[in-house]
Amino acid sequence: MAPTTTATAAAEQAPPPQHTRKAVGLAAHDDSGHLTPIRISRRKTGDDDVAIKVLYCGICHSDLHTIKNEWRNAVYPVVAGHEITGVVTEVGKNVARFKAGDEVGVGCMVNTCGGCESCRDGCENYCSGGVVFTYNSVDRDGTRTYGGYSDAVVVSQRFVVRFPSSAGGGAGAALPLDSGAPLLCAGVTVYAPMRQHGLCEAGKHVGVVGLGGLGHVAVKFARAFGMRVTVISTSPVKRQEALERLGADGFIVSTNASEMKAAMGTMHGIINTASASTSMHSYLALLKPKGKMILVGLPEKPLQIPTFALVGGGKILAGSCMGSISETQEMIDFAAEHGVAADIELIGADEVNTAMERLAKGDVRYRFVVDIGNTLRSD
C-alpha cells in the first residue's frame, strides 16, 4: 500500500463567502516550491456545478514552474495540478450531462467569459475575456483557484469532460483514470493542433520534436491516426525507446547534420514540443513545400524566424495553446477507442516533493501521476 500524507497540522484557510466545502490539498508557500498539506475551502455545489472526488492528478512541468515562481506570477499558497481525474459526488440542479458516480476529468481551465467570439466559436482556450486557469488564477467571483493536488474540486459543468468507463456499462473501451490524467494537458496540447492542421491523415509523414511528456503522447496519437512518424531529438540515447517501444518509424538526432540532411523535404508537418530554443531553419528544412510546423513548447528565448525558408517554400509556422473543451472530450474518446494513454509513474502524496526534484532534472518517463484518492488523507 502506498504511503499517506495527512493535513492534521495544516493551517486552516479562511473560506471566502459561499466557499464552505472543506478540502485538503498540497500547497507551496514560497518559491522553494516545497509542498506541504493544507486545508482549503471549495465553493458549495452551484446549480451548474459538478463536485468531484479527486482520485488522480498528473504533474505537469508548468506546475513546477509555478510553485517555484519561475514565471513570476505565483500567488501563494499555490495548490497546483490541472490533470485531474476522479468521480462525481454531486451535481447542481441544472446539470443533466453528469451524475454521481460518473468518471470525469478536469484540465487546464475552469472558467471563461462565455461571451467573446472565441467562446462563442467553441475556442474558449483563447477567450479574450481571460481564461480562468485551474490553479493560481482568479475566478469570476474574485477568489483564487486551487488545483488538483487536493481531494475535491467543484467545477462548472462546462469544463468537465467524461471519461469512458467500463463501470458505466457502455460498449466502448474504457480509459484508465491514472494514465489518462496527463491527456487532459499533455494529450490535448498535441492532439488539438494535429487535428486542426491536418496532421492526422493516414499515410502522411509527421515529425515530433522532443520525446518527453508531450512528445511521447504525440507519437502515440500519430500512430493511432495511421501516420508515418519520425522523432527528432537531441538525445541519441532515446533512439531505441522511440523506435522499439513507442513504435516510431524513424528517429533523427537533430545535432547530426547527415541525418538532418537525409530527411530534408520529407515531412508534411512537425509538432514541436521542445521548450529549449532551437534552430527553426533546420527544422523547416525537413518540411515538404507547404508543410506546417506547429509550436506547442515555450522556448526561454525568442526564436529567430527564417523568413526566406517560410516564404520560399510556402511553409506555415503556427502556435497552439491547450485545446478547447470539445477538443478535449473528442481527444479523450479517441484515446479510449485507440488505446492511447500516457506512460506514467504512479506516486503517493508524500512523494510529490521528490518527484518535483526529479522532474527538474528530467528524470521521469514520461509523466508523474499522484494517487490522490489512496494516499492524501485528512485525518
UniProtKB/Swiss-Prot annotation:
Organism domain of life: Eukaryota
Entry comment describing in which tissues the protein is expressed: Expressed in roots, first internodes and panicles. Expressed in the vascular bundles and sclerenchyma cells below the epidermis in leaves and stems.
Disruption of the gene: reported phenotype: Reduced lignin content, late heading time, semi-dwarf and flexible culm.
GO MF entries: cinnamyl-alcohol dehydrogenase activity; coniferyl-alcohol dehydrogenase activity; zinc ion binding
Cofactor or coenzyme needed: Zn(2+)
GO biological process: lignin biosynthetic process
Enzyme class: oxidoreductase
Cofactor remark from the record: Binds 2 Zn(2+) ions per subunit.
Residue positions binding NADP(+): 62, 189, 210-215, 233-238, 273, 297, 320-322
Binding site for Zn(2+) 2: 113, 116, 119, 127
Biased composition (Low complexity): 1-13
Family annotation (PROSITE patterns): ADH_ZINC
Stretches for region Disordered: 1-21
Catalytic activities: (E)-cinnamyl alcohol + NADP(+) = (E)-cinnamaldehyde + NADPH + H(+); (E)-coniferol + NADP(+) = (E)-coniferaldehyde + NADPH + H(+); (E)-sinapyl alcohol + NADP(+) = (E)-sinapaldehyde + NADPH + H(+); (E)-4-coumaroyl alcohol + NADP(+) = (E)-4-coumaraldehyde + NADPH + H(+)
Pathway annotation: Aromatic compound metabolism; phenylpropanoid biosynthesis
Function statement: Involved in lignin biosynthesis. May catalyze the final step specific for the production of lignin monomers, like coniferyl alcohol, sinapyl alcohol and 4-coumaryl alcohol.
Protein family: Belongs to the zinc-containing alcohol dehydrogenase family.
Name the record gives this protein: Cinnamyl alcohol dehydrogenase 7
Organism name: Oryza sativa subsp. japonica (Rice)
